[in-house]
A protein has these predicted regions:
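Short glycine-rich substrate-engagement loop in P-loop NTPases that contacts/grips substrate
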Residues: 64-94
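Structural recognition of the conserved hydrophobic beta-strand(s) that form the central parallel beta-sheet
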Residues: 98, 122-128, 146
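Pre-Walker A adenine-sensing motif
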Residues: 16-34
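Conserved P-loop NTPase "ATPase switch" module shared by AAA+ and STAND
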Residues: 90-108
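Hydrophobic anchor at the beta1->P-loop junction of P-loop NTPases
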Residues: 38-41
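Accessory nucleic acid-recognition modules appended to NTPase machines
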Residues: 207-348, 356
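Conserved lysine of the Walker
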Residues: 49-50
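Interdomain motor-coupling "hinge/lid" segment immediately C-terminal to the ATP-binding subdomain
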Residues: 2-14, 128, 134-242, 249
Length: 403
């Protein structure tokens, strides 16, 4: 076990010698203010979990001998029992350990529970989004934190080097004209619409800034790793089914959400209905797919199929040769509202209903209120290709400032 600890220290030293990004996401502050014994960080592959954990680790007031970083996807940890490793570390003075890619460890759920019950040590671990979603016991025992893809606001902060305030949805609705004016004025020599189009293509994943040219290939590699490593491992998916998962994503990417049906998908991907439903659930847990329920689905007597979107607009640029612009806009809107912890459902009049109260129609400059005029609920248009809106016609890009 001592050899494994020494190897872990060498790997950690190598990581620390690399320059960490100076940009710090809001989730880092949330984790830093937590007093929980064991904390978990979950999110899609590629959103910056490792970077955030290393930033947090450098802020802690422990000596090097009292801290340890391990990544469970590294070969030296593959056959190591996680509880035994942490127990040995505690017995030799360990106070804090950061565990990356914990879902790669054998029987990690039981190991974490045993560590929580029997060992005195502070832990921050990371893993696939599917960990938190598939194991409700985690959120009861541990402090769990979500790290979403970069918002449009965060993308601008990294690209331009200065900060923008995030805004509540109510402020966007009530003060949209003033907010959009203020943001446009701060851009100096930049224009908001070209920046927004950049974000839709590549702005959700921080590694874009490391090597913009190779971003499409790296995002495609990320998708393949989620399918081949995370989902196949967590849900025991047979290797011959992985290509069907990828095919399912491509079919969804190339289709308009309202034109998709379970029958069409079972035919196109050659899956039975029960298997298809399982695969859709796996893809959502891996943050590759977003299933949006109808607002009436909560009434069991009313059966409505979910609308299916890719999880983030960047995925369309890799999985579709040319995606539908309407789908791209709706994907962005749903991704920003959901990441800001709003309930997103679809409705017959309009595109989405948010928090069961507010209806939104998404579209281009020519979109009007004709589809919304008979609604009793408050209704707004989220419009692409405009820099500044009107009272109930809000620039689509402004919904990227919610988190």
């Amino acid at each position: 076990m001592q050899n494994i600890i020494e190897n872990a220290r060498r790997l950690y030293l190598g990581l620390l010698q690399k320059k960490l990004p100076s940009y710090q996401r809001d989730t880092l502050e949330k984790i830093s203010s937590s007093n929980a014994k064991i904390m978990g960080l979950y999110g899609a592959r590629g959103v910056g979990k490792t970077t955030l954990m290393l930033q947090w680790l450098k802020q802690q007031n422990y000596t090097p001998s009292q801290t340890l970083y391990i990544s469970c996807d590294h070969a030296i940890f593959k056959e190591t029992n996680l509880f035994s490793l942490v127990e040995y570390f505690v017995q030799h003075g360990g106070k804090l350990i950061v565990i990356d890619e914990i879902h790669e460890a054998t029987d990690f759920e039981q190991s974490l529970k045993s560590i929580y019950d029997f060992l005195e040590i502070k832990i921050l671990f990371s893993g696939s989004s599917a960990i938190s979603l598939s194991n409700p016991d985690f959120s009861r025992r541990f402090a769990m934190f979500s790290l979403p893809q970069l918002s449009f606001r965060e993308y601008l902060e990294i690209k331009l080097g200065y900060s923008f305030q995030k805004h509540l949805l109510q402020d966007v609705l009530e003060k949209g004209i003033d907010l959009s004016f203020e943001i446009n004025q701060r851009l100096e020599n930049e224009k908001i619409l070209p920046l927004f189009n950049e974000y839709l293509a590549h702005g959700g994943y921080p590694y874009y800034f490391e090597d913009p040219i190779s971003f499409p290939q790296k995002l495609n590699d990320t998708i393949n790793l989620v399918l081949q490593m995370e989902l196949s491992h967590l849900f025991s998916i047979q290797p011959d089914k992985i290509d069907l998962l990828k095919k399912l994503l491509v079919v969804i990417c190339r289709s308009k959400p309202l034109e998709l049906s379970i029958e069409k998908l079972t035919t196109n991907v050659e899956l039975s209905k029960p298997t298809l439903y399982k695969f859709l659930d796996y893809l959502q847990k891996g943050e590759l797919l977003r299933q949006i329920p109808h607002e009436l689905k909560k009434y069991k007597s009313i059966r409505k199929a979910d609308k299916l979107y890719l999880f983030h607009p960047n995925l369309l640029s890799v999985l579709c040769v040319k995606g539908d612009i309407g789908t791209l806009r709706e994907t962005f809107f749903a991704s920003q509202l959901a990441a800001a912890n709003h309930l997103v459902e679809f409705t017959q009049q309009g595109d989405f209903v948010i928090d069961e109260e507010i209806v939104f129609e998404i579209g281009g400059k020519s979109k009007d209120f004709s589809q919304l005029k008979t609604l009793e609920k408050p209704a707004y248009l989220a419009i692409d290709d405009i820099e500044v809106g009107t009272e109930k016609k809000i620039p689509l890009w402004l919904f990227g400032f919610l988190y």
